[in-house]
Amino acid sequence: MAKTEKLLNRLEELRQETGVARTIFAVCPNSLSVIRASFRAAKRNNAPIYFAATLNQIDGDGGYTGMTQSMFTKMLQFEADRVNYTGCSIVAIDHGGPWLKDKQRVEKWSTEDAMNGVKKSFEDAALAGYDLIHVDPTVDINVAKGDVIDIH
């Protein structure tokens, strides 16, 4: 069964057991402390957890957390094991797209370089075992502020 389906089924099971509707507990993993606290909270509440990492946080260059995608998934497994968290977890790229990584925008990467960079990030995430990739094509540094991006 796909992880997302398992997660949604678990939320429905909890609703039926308790009569309380729940939402998905999503975490922006910007530090080890946040990740550890998230696993403890998810375990305490018998809840599934969704880690939504931006490319600024976690990427091939280490992002500002110092973690690559592979390091991140290994660390998540280690931390889950450390607190004996056995619930469902989803690992995702959040807002992945060209120029959404600060470095690409600040350094004014070309369209080709920005696209190649994000494709490499997506590939690394898939190889590391990510469950979801949120593709976000909403930034184009070549479009004037206020103009609509022509996505074709």
Which residue ranges define each predicted feature?
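Active-site beta-loop-alpha junctions enriched in small/polar residues
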Residues: C28-L32, T54-I58, D94-P98, T138-D140
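N-terminal amphipathic alpha-helix/helix-capping segment at the start of soluble metabolic enzymes
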Residues: M1-F25, A37-R40
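Glycine-rich loop at the start of a catalytic domain that most often binds anionic cofactors/ligands
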Residues: R40-N45, G60-M71
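Active-site beta->alpha loop and helix N-cap motifs at the rims of alpha/beta catalytic domains
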Residues: G66-H152
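Core catalytic machinery and nucleic-acid-binding channels of phosphodiester-processing enzymes
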Residues: N30-S33, N45, Q57, R82, ...
